[in-house]
Structure formats: structure tokens, C-alpha cells
UniProtKB/Swiss-Prot annotation:
Native species: Methanosarcina mazei (strain ATCC BAA-159 / DSM 3647 / Goe1 / Go1 / JCM 11833 / OCM 88) (Methanosarcina frisia)
Residue numbers binding Mg(2+): 202, 254
Name of the protein in its database record: Type 2 DNA topoisomerase 6 subunit A
SUPFAM superfamilies xref list: DNA topoisomerase IV, alpha subunit
Residues at the active site: 106 (o-(5'-phospho-dna)-tyrosine intermediate)
Length: 369
């Protein structure tokens, strides 16, 4: 097993090196041919999202933006691209090392004119390299700053670590917080499970409530804490459990426009990382709630929508990820009532209400129980 893992890692490193060298070679050849160096990338805007019938997720369309040395800004971007490419090849891949996104920003301080002005700039460059190579950043040994979230439920896994294999049952062998999802979930193998569903939960409070109330045992549910906008590793493990094990997924968030985007990132992918949608998005994931109609039906405690909330909801009406009749009706209802609610609002009906009344009713309505 360890030999297979090592061989797979070496093949991945060789592929990443080959793809990164192709970028450098293209720029070098443009110089040789006395052509102004440039690279083209998909435009990362909402207007350039297209639905892929093949994969059922939203991906980038044909609109492109050019990074060209014709301008000073473009020349600096290409310079930084070559420095980063050289660093990833010679420091990460050649020496089997890795860095966080934050570390890369600080490492660039030694790159003279290629130094990044802010971390957002270095983050975007790594995303550019993902697009240009058609590889995920993990192939370059780049690690995110944030941890993956946690999960708790009836599934047994094997995780490959630097210290060998770990066999873990995600109910019996973990503490109250659950199993910590690693940043590279390709190191996980699923062994066996008794799960009938996955509930991906936005807030830590609701995740803890479902665990305390025994919802995982009562409904054979794998509970996944999204920790707000989910990390890549969280989205990836949800997709893998859905596709490889056939476990249906429901996403349970707060009832506001920002939370609907959390659902969209799980189901369809995020706008800024649409190049990874086919790898991370779970188009079969269903939106459980909290729905605007739930606010009305259960007379939940609410807050008034802010101007930013209203603007975000109106923006979602033109977002291709929310173009279904269901979403248009729910968003319009929320605009009409002018209210939003948190998951924890169900506590106003009693600590057991969400697990004994709301979730069973909603899951039956969705055909999941």
C-alpha cells in the first residue's frame, strides 16, 4: 500500500513538473520568436459561467482575458508567474517540500520586482496555474491556510499520513468534535459505511446540536460541518462520498443570501474556482434549508434584511446557479417578507424541535427518508 502511494505521488509530481515547464517553455518560445509574451485565461466572472450538461456543474465559458507584456501590469504578472513556476518546480517538486498560500506570499519577498503586493495576488496566481495546467494546487504541494472542517457519522475510513496508515471509524474513534478532514482528501480510502444520507451543515452550533441529539444514529446520517464557506477539502470529500459510495447529500444552512451561496458552492461550484467544479462540486446535493418559506411556516425569530442582503438576493436572481423556479420563488418570497433567519432560530421552539420535527418533515418532503 505504501509503495503504491509513493508511486502515485511520484507520478503526480512528474505530471505537475511537466505542466509547469510547458508554461515556462511557452513564454520562452515567445521571446525566441520575438513575439510579445502573453498567456490567456478564462474570464472569472458570473457572465462567463456556463452549465455543463456533461458534468451537471457550472464551468467557465469561452470569454478570456489576456496577461500580456504589452502593458507594465501584464509584464509584472508574467514575471511573477515565472518566478512562482520556478519556485514550485525547484523547491517543492524537486525537494518534496510544500508551503501554505500565506507562506508563498512571504517567500516572494526575496523575488525583487516579482514580489507580491498582497496575499490575494499570490492566491490568484496559484489559481491561474491551476487553470493553465488543469491540475489542482495540491499537485504543486500548495496547502491552504484553513483546515478542512469535521465530520461525524457511520463511516469507516483509512487515511494515509506521513506516519503510516490510520483506520478510523468516524463515530467510534473520534472525539466530540468529529473527524478532522485533511487538506488532501485523496489520501483517504473509504472502507465501509452504514450511512443513508450526508447532512452538510453551515454552523458549528447546529452541527453540535445534531450530534448531541443523536441525529446521526437515529437516521444513519454523516454530519459534515462546513464552517461557513466550505474549504476545498470539505467540498471534495462530500463529492467523493456521494459519487463513490452513492450517499445522497442535503445542505443545511442559515436562511440568508450568503448561505444560499454556500449551498451553491457545494452543489455547483464557486465563481472564482469554476475551473475546479467538476472535481469538487456535487450537483446531486439538495438544499434542505433554512428556506424563506420555513421562516413563514414555522414563525421563526428573524432579523430584518440589510441593504447588502437585498442587493445580494437580487444579484442571485440573475445568477445562473439560482435560475430554477424553486430558487426564484424562494428568493422572491424573502424579498417580499424582508426577513432572514439563522439555523439556531429553531431553538426557540425547543432544543429537540429541529431534530424531531423540522428535519424529519423536510427530509420526507425531499424524498430522503
Amino acid at each position: 500500500m505504501e509503495g503504491e502511494k509513493g508511486s502515485k505521488t511520484r507520478k503526480g509530481d512528474a505530471l505537475a513538473r511537466e505542466k509547469l515547464l510547458e508554461i515556462a517553455e511557452k513564454i520562452y518560445n515567445q521571446f525566441e520568436e520575438e513575439v510579445v509574451p502573453s498567456v490567456s485565461l478564462p474570464s472569472r466572472t458570473k457572465a462567463n459561467l456556463e452549465y455543463s450538461d456533461e458534468s451537471d456543474v457550472w464551468v467557465y465559458g469561452d470569454r478570456e482575458s489576456e496577461r500580456s507584456a504589452k502593458t507594465v501590469k501584464g509584464a509584472f504578472q508574467l514575471l511573477k508567474t515565472t518566478y512562482a513556476t520556478d519556485f514550485l518546480i525547484n523547491e517543492h517538486l524537486a525537494r518534496n517540500r510544500g508551503s501554505t498560500l500565506r507562506e508563498l506570499y512571504y517567500i516572494s519577498e526575496g523575488w525583487d520586482y516579482a514580489k507580491f503586493k498582497e496575499q490575494g495576488e499570490s492566491d490568484r496566481l496559484i489559481e491561474d496555474l491551476e487553470i493553465l495546467t488543469s491540475l489542482q494546487r495540491e499537485y504543486f504541494h500548495m496547502r491552504p491556510e484553513e483546515d478542512g472542517a469535521t465530520m461525524f457519522g457511520p463511516i469507516e475510513i483509512t487515511e494515509q499520513t506521513k506516519r503510516g496508515e490510520r483506520n478510523i471509524h468516524c463515530q467510534k474513534d473520534v472525539g466530540e468534535g468529529g473527524y478532522q478532514i485533511p487538506f488532501n482528501v485523496e489520501n483517504i480510502e473509504f472502507q465501509k459505511h452504514d450511512a443513508s444520507m450526508i447532512i452538510a451543515i453551515e454552523t458549528g452550533g447546529m452541527y453540535a446540536r445534531l450530534m448531541e441529539n443523536g441525529f446521526d444514529e437515529a437516521y444513519n446520517a454523516i454530519l459534515v460541518h462546513l464552517k461557513g464557506q466550505p474549504a476545498r477539502s470539505t467540498r471534495r470529500i462530500i463529492k467523493r462520498m456521494n459519487e463513490e459510495l452513492g450517499i445522497p447529500v442535503a445542505v443545511f444552512t442559515d436562511g440568508d443570501p450568503w448561505s444560499y451561496r454556500i449551498y451553491a458552492s457545494v452543489a455547483y461550484g464557486a465563481i472564482k474556482s469554476a475551473h475546479l467544479s467538476e472535481f469538487m462540486a456535487t450537483p446531486a446535493a439538495k438544499f434542505l434549508g433554512l428556506q424563506p418559506s420555513d421562516i413563514v411556516e414555522y414563525e421563526l425569530s428573524t432579523d430584518k434584511l440589510t441593504e447588502q442582503d437585498v442587493s445580494a438576493l437580487r444579484s442571485e436572481l440573475s445568477d445562473p446557479r439560482f435560475e430554477s423556479d424553486y430558487w426564484k420563488e424562494q428568493i422572491q418570497l424573502q424579498l417580499d417578507i424582508g426577513k432572514k433567519a439563522e439555523q439556531q432560530a429553531f431553538a426557540g421552539k425547543g432544543l429537540d424541535f429541529v431534530t424531531e420535527v423540522y428535519l424529519p418533515n423536510r427530509l420526507k418532503e425531499m424524498g430522503m427518508i
